[in-house]
Amino acid sequence: MKAMRTLTAASAGAVVAGALLWAPAAAFAVTGTTYYVDPGGSDSADGLSPSTAWKSLAKVNAQTLSPGDAVLFEAGGQWSGQLAPHGSGAAGSPITIGAYGSGAKPRIDGGGTVDAAVKIANQHDVTVSGLEVTNTGSGATPRIGIQVTASDYGPVDRISVTGTYVHDIQGATSGNDSSNPSVGGIVVSALGGTTPTYYRDLSITDNEVANSRSYGIVTWSSWMQREGWTSLWDFMPVPAGGYRAWTPSTGVVVSGNNVHDISAGGITVMQAQGARIDHNRVDKTAQNHGNVGIWWAGADDTVVEYNEVSGTKYWGLSSDGNGFDADASVHRSLIQYNYSHDNEGGFFIAVSTGTGPAEATIRYNVSQGDGNQIFALSTNAKNIDVYNNTIWTPLTPFIANNPDRAGFSLVKVWNTSVSNVSFRNNIIYNGAGLAYRDSAAVSYDRNLYFSGPVPSKDAAAIVTDPQLTAPGAATGIGDLGGYLPTAASPAIAAGLTIPLNGGKDAVGTPLPSGMPDLGALQRTAGQGRNEAAPVVTASLGNGQSTVPASIADGRDSTPWASPSSGVTFPQTITLEFPSDRVVSGIEFATTFGTGQGIKTLDVQAWQNGAWATVLTGGSLTWTGGSATVERRALSLPAAVTTAKLRIVVKSANLTWGNIAVSEISTR
């Protein structure tokens, strides 16, 4: 949750300039009535044509609209006060509030005299499009640009706000209301205490929101109680005892918006199931106090992708200022294919409240020039899986000249409740020399480190220059090619094979079925399959509380071992993949290889309904006798296409009576 947030608190968290041209015949399944509004019109006219247009907002507000109706404002026209139309549409026949003619978007100016310049209240199937909206006034009264709200209404279907320009929403300039999620540019709320109220198919797309004294785009609900999170902030417009059990909105899409110059949070989605936050540009948020560019809370299965977030302001070591935040009571968040840069507070934060977790998978993102804490992990941050990201953190002027620089971190754990955090397959350039202030809850596996400290816990660390094409020079999310590995890069085909990895990299290149490149960009395209792990069986059985599945689970840290007695040869390890793949080589990863590593082997592939030997007399030589992961690769004489591989183990080091394998991967 975000209010005036600190990490240590128990906390809950290009738009077309011209007017939309109207084509009613193509827009509706059922044709309604189209009403026209012109500043030079007359409220005594019928409003049914541009030449007989209505004049005022009051006339529009007095009309009860029906499914398929449209109210169109003349391009270039200006109106003062509040636009609050009445009536609801129907599925396939929404009520549309929009524009006609050519020129600038019609402007609705609340003038600071109304709570919201545009208000949609207890209505469904309504589309607001192509308007310019502003609401600026003096004093500390909270104000909103476009407000969608419902109370004790039940499901609210198919609300859309699209192609608007909302700007200069000025309420409180300091204090709680300047960080109030019920105030901002576009605000959607679900309230009440008797009838669970929530949105279905809520769409906020292709809007520009600028210069808001509180939030940019936010959805929130008083139907939010779960997992020990019982209320939002005391300054929210909910009476004492007014919060109710979690009832999430569904089908929420926040996409293609340009949000910038915002006092608090840029885009926030709360109390939602399966929300999508994608293709947004967010810049210069948290300008008045600690907050985050994009964050979500009380939300499950949220997908945050293809966003560019920058310029979030720094407010101190323990305050927010990150690009992205998985906040209070969130399960199974997915953050992928984003570009985070120049966020003074860092790239990502996870923090919750009550007993609920903040869960997230963070994959195939690029962070360039972020500061403070690149990854911040606080209360109840759990099941955080960070893999195949490229983190490029040079010594920027912001870091070099900041008086708090000594406290900056690459990874920072704030709370003992943090658990099950892993970093795998990442490229981390740490020219700023930021520290790793983590805990036993954080693991590292097969990351590439260039400059700065290296976590001692990464037993498979690769410490070298990643040899990328032109790193640190990206100018936008469409310009990430500088992070592509060169042909000589040690990152190529060096990664763990992680199941269900999404099938593509940060720029859409299909991933291989076997070992990927490290970092966010894949040099050579693969088959692009998003597959589960193979089924693994071992003829020797299991020892030391291990299971064969660990051999191909995408983690060096979870090895398989045979029993420590009775080992004879030959023995087999079989991998059955979800589908055929092309295999040109096999890599083995092992710890304490001189004591328990496989020495000689054959490789068989399942072809034409039988096992065929494709490599005879393969040999692995291990030199390490420690917990450091060693990796040895064998190339096949010729590539094979198969859905099953069998490793026939002919001999092994048996110092302790067993053999062990950390990971087997294909190339």
Language-model features: where?
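Extracellular beta-strand/beta-solenoid scaffold signature
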Residues: 84, 111-119, 140-152, 174-199, ...
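Right-handed parallel beta-helix/beta-spiral solenoid domain characteristic of secreted/periplasmic
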Residues: 54, 72-73, 88-141, 168-178, ...
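Acidic Gly/Asp/Thr-rich repetitive segments characteristic of extracellular carbohydrate-active
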Residues: 39-74, 78-79, 117, 489, ...
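C-terminal accessory segments
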Residues: 459-524
